[in-house]
Regions:
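Conserved phosphate-binding/catalytic region of the ribokinase-like
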Residues: 1-116
Length: 116
C-alpha cells in the first residue's frame, strides 16, 4: 500500500510511538510492535530511531534492504534505539550507544525471532 502511493520513494518508515513502526524498503513491507520499556521521556525518540536506521545502513549498505530478513533487522535495530532513548531524561543524554542497543536486542532475540 505504501509503495503504491509513493512509488518514486526508495523506502518509507512510519513510526507511531508505542504503536510500533511500519516500513516499506525495496519490495519488503512490514509492521513491528514497539518495545515495552519504562518510559521517562519521549523527546528525541524519533531522531534516535533515524540514527539507529542510518547506523545500520552505514554498516550493511542500502542494497542490503532488498533482503527481507535484513530489512526487518535494520528496522528492529532502529526501533530498539528509539525505545531506549525514552528510558532516560533528555534528548541528547538519552541517546544509547551501539553496544547498549545490541545488548538490549540480545536480551530479546527469542522474543523477536531475529538477531541483529
Amino acid at each position: 500500500a505504501i509503495a503504491y502511493r509513493l512509488n518514486t520513494a526508495e523506502g518509507v518508515l512510519i513510526t507511531d510511538g508505542d504503536k510500533g513502526c511500519s516500513y516499506c524498503l525495496s519490495e519488503n513491507e512490514g509492521k513491528l510492535p514497539s518495545f515495552s520499556v519504562p518510559v521517562v521521556e519521549t523527546t528525541g525518540a524519533g531522531d534516535s530511531f533515524v540514527a539507529g536506521f542510518v547506523h545500520q545502513l552505514s554498516k550493511l549498505g542500502i542494497h542490503s534492504l532488498a533482503d527481507a530478513k535484513i530489512a526487518k533487522q535494520v528496522v528492529t535495530y532502529a526501533t530498539a534505539t528509539g525505545a531506549l532513548t525514552t528510558t532516560k531524561p533528555g534528548a541528547i543524554a538519552a541517546q544509547p550507544t551501539a553496544a547498549e542497543v545490541e545488548a538490549f536486542l540480545e536480551g530479546r532475540g527469542e522474543e523477536l525471532g531475529t538477531t541483529v
